[in-house]
Regions:
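A short glycine-rich, Lys/Arg-flanked "PGG" loop and its adjoining helix->strand segment in the class I
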Residues: 127-139
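Conserved N-terminal segment of class I S-adenosyl-L-methionine
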Residues: 1-107, 113
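Conserved catalytic-core segments centered on acid/base and nucleophilic motifs
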Residues: 71, 122, 136
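A structural signal for short, well-ordered beta-strand segments and their strand-loop junctions
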Residues: 73, 116, 135, 144-146
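A short SAM/SAH-binding and catalytic strip from SAM-dependent methyltransferases
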Residues: 113-124
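Glycine-rich, histidine-containing beta strand-loop boundary motifs that form or position
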Residues: 75-76, 98, 118, 147-149
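Conserved class I S-adenosyl-L-methionine
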Residues: 142-174
Length: 178
């Protein structure tokens, strides 16, 4: 299996604690616009079917689902899927799958589009994960991906600062939410 159990459990806990329900709607819509502004909506066929790989809380799916016929929301974390189901309960065109990127039950070559934002770099073999996603797409179908960059070419001090901020982020994520 091409996933890290600790990462899956950690993000499941984070999505459960911070389910995006208190985030300002205008802020979420602006974030969606920044990520999806280059997505080629106009090339999608009528009644498109696609996937959100690593859907988390469903924050992107809530904006994509109204534009498509069917959206497959995939996540390896049951906790994340529970949050996504709750957040997307009014979207009757979302189908939820608990699966890792390499065992997704979508047929190869069947999807009109796909996206995975901020997810695949957390998978042990990122290249294999990307290949698994692309394999699900019809020929020429668009796939929007956002990967965090590698620290390989960064100086040691930069990596140390990042580690401190990451530890701080993890600690804050575990604080109780009022």
């Amino acid at each position: 299996m091409n996933y890290d159990k600790e990462t899956v459990e950690g993000f499941g806990q984070e999505w459960q604690a911070f389910d995006q329900s208190s985030v300002d709607e205008h802020e979420l819509h602006a974030l969606f616009g920044r990520y999806f502004d280059l997505f080629p909506w106009r090339v999608l066929p009528e009644n498109p079917v696609g996937f959100d790989m690593g859907c988390g809380s469903g924050r992107w799916a809530r904006f994509v689902a109204p534009r498509v016929d069917t959206l497959h929301c995939v996540d390896a974390s049951q906790r994340a899927l529970d949050v996504a189901r709750r957040n997307l309960r009014e979207m009757n065109n979302c189908v939820f799958h608990r699966a890792s990127v390499d065992d997704t039950p979508l047929p190869d070559g069947s999807m009109d589009f796909g996206y995975s934002l901020g997810v695949l770099h957390h998978v042990p073999d990122t290249a294999a994960a990307l290949t698994a996603c692309v394999r699900k797409l019809k020929p020429g179908a668009p796939f929007l991906v956002y990967l965090y960059y590698s620290f390989d070419n960064r100086p040691g001090w930069y990596r140390r600062v990042w580690r401190v901020t990451d530890i701080t982020r993890r600690m804050i994520s575990r604080l109780p939410f009022p």
